[in-house]
Amino acid sequence: MNTQPRSLAATLFPIGLLLIAMASIQSGASLAKSMFPIIGAQGTTTLRLIFASIIMLLILRPWRVRMTTNTLRNVVIYGMALGGMNFLFYMALQTVPIGIAVALEFTGPLAVAIFSSRRPIDFLWIALAIAGLLLLLPAGHSGQALDPVGAAYALGAGVCWALYILFGQRAGAEHGIQSAALGVVVAALFVAPIGIAHAGSALLTPAVIPMALAVAILSTALPYSLEMVALTRIPARTFGTLMSIEPAFGALSGLLFLGEMLTLTQWLAILAIITASVGTTLSMRKATSPAIAAD
């Protein structure tokens, strides 16, 4: 008689974990943005990745695994993509509201999903994504036009996110999350020279260290752990569908913590990109469901 409540709880639990993870990531982004006046986006990215790599090395101890040359190459590319994604996203946050930056960045994984499917319905999702981009990107009008450099940084972060997905799948095929830990180390080494050159001794400012540690936990250690638990309890495509609402979390985080007000047009643009991402994921699930049933 208790089967249905247990089934409902088993469904809601991983969803709750993902919602907490998304809230954690965007809260970390808001806190990171408050550090920019002190050490800049470059220094903030550097400290976040350094602390995150230390945390993940201590917890996962990836040096215990042996990797082939091919896997190690994939880990290095994966780590560079991760570093580029974090760096460019934080550079975008200097002039672009968090919600819009996340939506622009989300075009990376959306493109990977669409181009890997190539079903007729995907043209609808492409059109929705393009419509969202056209609403968000500067169009020469006054008032709420986005900074073009910031928008370019966010789109660049999306490209890095796409590479992160492609090479992350290859790097993680043999050693899973241990590869992710090594990737974070590579990302830290990749970005550190830029952050040190920009911020210098300001990186050691006493007030900055605890904030950077909090950002590393909120944006990396905690959400990674929660997402890993959730992935063991729900299908990967359901996971992808739920993650599609992350731009909305970014917009809400910017509103609550930084007072970033978005226009109705910008909210509609974010909604269009979210809808395109959800639609793509659901279309992929329908396309693969016969094969799953056959197994």
Language model features by range: what are they?
Residues M1-G43, I77-M80, G84-L88, A131, ...:
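Glycine-/small-residue-enriched transmembrane alpha-helix faces in small-molecule transporters
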Residues M35, T44, R48, A92, ...:
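Hydrophobic/aromatic residues within transmembrane alpha-helices
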Residues I77-M80, T107, I121-G140, A157, ...:
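Hydrophobic transmembrane alpha-helices of multi-pass small-molecule transport proteins
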Residues N2-S7, L49, V208, S244-D295:
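C-terminal-most transmembrane helix of multi-pass membrane proteins
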Residues G43-S53, L82, F89-P120, A157, ...:
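Specific alpha-helical transmembrane segments that line the substrate/conduction pathway
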Residues P14, P37-G84, V112, C160-Y164, ...:
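Transmembrane alpha-helices of multi-pass small-molecule transport proteins
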Residues M1-A23, S53-I77, R118-L124, S142-L146, ...:
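Membrane-interface interhelical linkers
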Residues L47, A101-L104, F167-A188, T220-L256:
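Helix-helix packing/entry segments at the starts of transmembrane helices
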